[in-house]
């Protein structure tokens, strides 16, 4: 009952709302440090990865980064360390990494890139995510994969989808007019109309 919860200010606020009791707390922010008696934790703000209150914790002396959900996967094998991942399991792991990234981090690509930028000055020997293997190997590779996945490809086709339903045809005319306006402003955009009416 006398522990002190150390977290971002947002996390402390959320936790107070969840547990409905008061507790001792210490809010930490970007670059704050905590002396654990011979070991030092440095905190790195990483909002929306994938919670608004996320912070990374860096164990300075050991060069270990605790990243909450970042660089994680829903993947398990007979060991814990990435260096022990059998070569024949690599494709499964990479699929799991992507399947974890897409729903959790793809909506927050700009935040992923900001977090990666804050890591550029750190020596990291190990990443401990909340899920999946502990990255004691391939650290730079996995970070670069996240960076690649989070970098927008502006050469990709620009597409506008206009779904509509039209009981009497007027909404269809409006949708077609919007399409014409878009193409007039930018002829390099592909515009697709989708009639949502259910045909019997």
Predicted segments — roles?
Residues 12-15, 73-74:
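Short gly/pro/ser/thr-enriched loop/turn and capping motifs at secondary-structure boundaries
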Residues 60, 64-65, 71-94, 103-156:
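Divalent-metal (often Zn2+) His-rich catalytic cores of metallo-beta-lactamase-fold enzymes
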Residues 1-6:
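Active-site metal-binding motif and surrounding structural segment of the metallo-beta-lactamase
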Residues 98-109, 164-168:
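Short acidic-aromatic active-site loops that bind/stabilize oxyanions
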Residues 20-87:
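Catalytic core of the metallo-beta-lactamase
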Residues 9-13, 30:
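Short, polar loop motifs at secondary-structure junctions
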Residues 138-200:
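N-terminal beta1-alpha1-beta2 submodule of the flavodoxin-like/Rossmannoid cofactor-binding fold
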Residues 45-55, 102-110, 192:
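Active-site glycine- and acidic-residue-rich loops that bind
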